Amino acid sequence: RPLPEETSRKMIRNEFGGINESFYNLYALTGDERYRWLAGFFYHNDVIDPLKEQRDDLGTKHTNTFIPKVLAEARNYELTGDGDSKALSEFFWHTMIGRHTFAPGCSSDKEHYFDPDEFSKHISGYTGETCCTYNMLKLSRHLFCWEASPEVADYYERALYNHILGQQDPATGMVSYFLPLQSGTHKVYSTPENSFWCCVGSGFESHAKYAESIYYRGEDCLYVNLFIPSELAWKEKGLNLRQETRFPEEETTRLTLALETPRRLAVKLRYPSWSGRPTVRVNGKSVRVKQHPRSYITLDRRWEDGDRIEVTYPMRLAMERMPDNPRKGALLYGPVVLAGVLGTEGMQPPAPYSNPLRYNDYYIYDYHIPQGLPCSLPWDDRHPERVLKRTGKGLTFVTESGVQVLPLYDVHRQRYVVYWDCMEQ
């Protein structure tokens, strides 16, 4: 017997994850209309209707309750061609990335949205729920399959390196629920037997997905979106491609093509928004780059077995200011968010782990932040190299005051600063 409308509306206000997307997937596999009906049953008017009207009504809603409901709409578009579902998914993505996403590619404060652009009021120890970034990456993959957008690929890279990669403790494999952005906080990791948070599930799954969006294919083209050492086998084209790089610790990536027979193919290399003018060589010969950042460099030619492509993307230091407080900003080197390392003073056990004896400890964690941590940075947009000196060891820098600065993904078991107090020089 059908549920009364008020009962069903009350039920779907809760966080039910991706069950509606799962029903759409079952419909795709079976063609059984009952699954499509069930997916539609979980349509949440209060969430989806404002997006249909192109309104940012996110307010203080629970972030990861919201994103899977949009993912279901993206899947609905793919299966039914519903134009409203496509438009609202794209509007939501652009709204999230443009007005609700911090520099590392994460969103939310204490699991909730905040008013558009009001970032400086929400730099807390409870920012950046991992599940939210996991699902935004998932939505990004849907959007890129609809249209090969370098903007979407830029975000994917930013979130993958700065949030997902740095979310796992390299010493134990444990993962963090939040990515704290308050100065002086540290990452808080799960424990092996007592922390079964949602972000443990999505966290572990995320680290099995690094190969998922390196390459995309069109009918006669290949998109190279991420610069990650990898091998691609495209059986239909008789193509094997090998990518070799130490990015982001080096600026160059090298691709070698192995072909059963010569073939014409457009290889599309992402030209990131953060890059200076790239240099491109095919079999050692320079190729003129006419494109602009946030586009694709297209190498459309007849390829032969053993052909080589070498691309160098110049990286530079930059300060990304908060829109509501330009005196606060995050340091980036290329797509990599840099953090100042602030040591371990005041970190009391069970730090850096969650306390299994306290329910939802990650949500009320006391960081015991010491006073007087060096979180200010004299900054000069014209001469950033005067502010930060590279030490020659990977992506390691040091400030004039002696604070070591590393990629955020490399800072573990220590306090850090991501959003600096900027003092203009």
Predicted regions and their residues:
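Well-ordered alpha-helical segments within folded domains of soluble proteins
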Residues: M11-A28, K61-E78, G128-F144, V200-Y210, ...
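Structural helix-adjacent loops and short alpha-helical linkers that scaffold large soluble proteins
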Residues: Y27-G40, Y77-E90, I97, L143-D154, ...
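Flexible glycine/proline-rich, aromatic-decorated loop/lid segments
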Residues: H100-E118
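C-terminal beta-rich recognition modules with glycine/proline-rich loops and embedded aromatic residues
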Residues: S89, A153-N162, Q167-A258, V282, ...
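Long, well-ordered core segments of solenoidal/helical folds
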Residues: R1-P4, R34-Q54, L88-G105, R158-D169
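Beta-strand-rich binding/interaction modules
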Residues: P262-V282
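Asp-box/WD-like beta-propeller blade repeats and closely related beta-sheet repeat scaffolds
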Residues: R1-N14
